[in-house]
Amino acid sequence: MSGMGEKSEQISKSARSTDPQEQESVALASQCVGEGRVLKIRGGVVDVFFTEHIPRIHDLVYAGDLAMEVAALLDQGTVRCIALTPVRGLGLGMPVHATGAPIQVPVGEAVLGRMLNVFGEPIDGKPAPNATISRSIHQAPPVLEERVVHSTILETGIKAIDLLSPIERGGKTGLFGGAGVGKTVLITELINNTAQHHKGVSLFCGIGERSREAEELYREMGEAGVRDKTVMLFGQMSEAPGVRFLVGKTALTMAEYFRDDLGQDVLLLIDNVFRFVQAGSEVSGLLGRMPSRVGYQPTLATELASLQERITSTRKGAITSIQAVYVPADDFTDPAAAHIFSHLSASVVLSRKRASEGLYPAVDPLASTSVMLTPAVVGQRHYDIARAVRRTLAEYEELRDIIAMLGLEELSAADRTVVARARRLERFLTQPFFSAESFSGEIGARVSVAETLAGCERILQQTKFADDEIDYYMIGALPEQKTAV
């Protein structure tokens, strides 16, 4: 954590900025800088008394090197703060310095290729970004008249997603699943596939994830040659709940600058949005708020909206977001999962049953949805093939119980054909990932939408099957020799 002198220098640098929005923030800050004393310490919550110039909600204050954000005003002179760094060494009566402004983070091309924390400070061992502009992490979402809706899809190269749950450019897509079904591997593959073909800027925001995953991702993106057009931000699971709660807003502030000021399209990948909700619940508990359903904070819907509503497209550019969402105990009626669902244009549901069968990615073809899967957007052929695939897999699900009780031989010829098609479709929708090459031993494959449609169409047209269904497992595009019989 940087010392107090460095913070003062950063504030002075902000005052010299040519950015009008930042100059206005600094002008307001000069009216609110004050000194206070620590009044009470309760875990990560610190009460501070100010005699004058009481800081505002979201303002950043410092007690030595300890950073805190003002979360509540208790009375005329007392504020309640959430610690953003360890409180070790903090004592009653210690002086507290108010900066007069929220957290300000560097934005612009200077942050590309860097790994940063919630304060915009480097955690990659390199010098601080040489940025001339900084912005507050607390920004209002664009007004309705500035928003635009795109009717184009973002091709991922992953068959199951592109076919059944296409991602909207400028939309929000959720990867839902319980523990151990492959959310992080899938989002890492999406980074590998989309960042290399994405013409704009990519941001990865790790909320409450393992430090090991951050290091691996940083190295892999360097090896893939996409790090120079990517910003990585982390609020790791070992950090204070306030950090995990705010790091998503830091990522959005940087993404908004690329979109609004530089006119670029942004790909924002978040792993994991549930950790944002979890951190909000911890902060709410520290502040003494009464919990709501299943122990979540009463402000769950408001806090999610404050994050999700900033992810949108404007006339200047688009922010396309792909978010991993942990589902506690595989319960999709959990309030956190239910609230996140309502903000998304596409939902990719990962099934534990499919994962247990070795069908990776474990995308549930019947539960995954997208508003983009309409003839007007993807075309009539894509729409018809996707519907036929879903119908075939749904019929197979209905036949599973009969097969388990009586055996496959007791089915009619038509039903046996449905089962053969469905099992081949299930295996064809599996795919070797570039991000999993090191532990799977399979060479990764990126498959175009056209190749995916052609492969599914050929399987759906088959009436007799001379090949083995295992031949369709963990391949990319369907080889030419696999023709209908």
From Swiss-Prot:
Entry membrane topology: Peripheral membrane protein
Residues where ATP binds: G177, G178, A179, G180, V181, G182, K183, T184
Superkingdom: Bacteria
Tagged with keyword Cell membrane: yes
Compositional bias of kind Polar residues: 11-24
Bias (Basic and acidic residues): 1-10
GO cellular component, one term: plasma membrane
Record's keyword terms, sorted: ATP synthesis, ATP-binding, Cell inner membrane, Cell membrane, CF(1), Hydrogen ion transport, Ion transport, Membrane, Nucleotide-binding, Translocase, Transport
Signal peptide start-end: none
EC class name: translocase
Subcellular location: Cell inner membrane
Assembly, per entry: F-type ATPases have 2 components, CF(1) - the catalytic core - and CF(0) - the membrane proton channel. CF(1) has five subunits: alpha(3), beta(3), gamma(1), delta(1), epsilon(1). CF(0) has three main subunits: a(1), b(2) and c(9-12). The alpha and beta chains form an alternating ring which encloses part of the gamma chain. CF(1) is attached to CF(0) by a central stalk formed by the gamma and epsilon chains, while a peripheral stalk is formed by the delta and b chains.
HAMAP family named among the record's database cross-references: ATP_synth_beta_bact
Protein family according to the UniProt entry: Belongs to the ATPase alpha/beta chains family.
Function description: Produces ATP from ADP in the presence of a proton gradient across the membrane. The catalytic sites are hosted primarily by the beta subunits.
Name of the protein in question: ATP synthase subunit beta 2
Gene name for this UniProt entry: atpD2
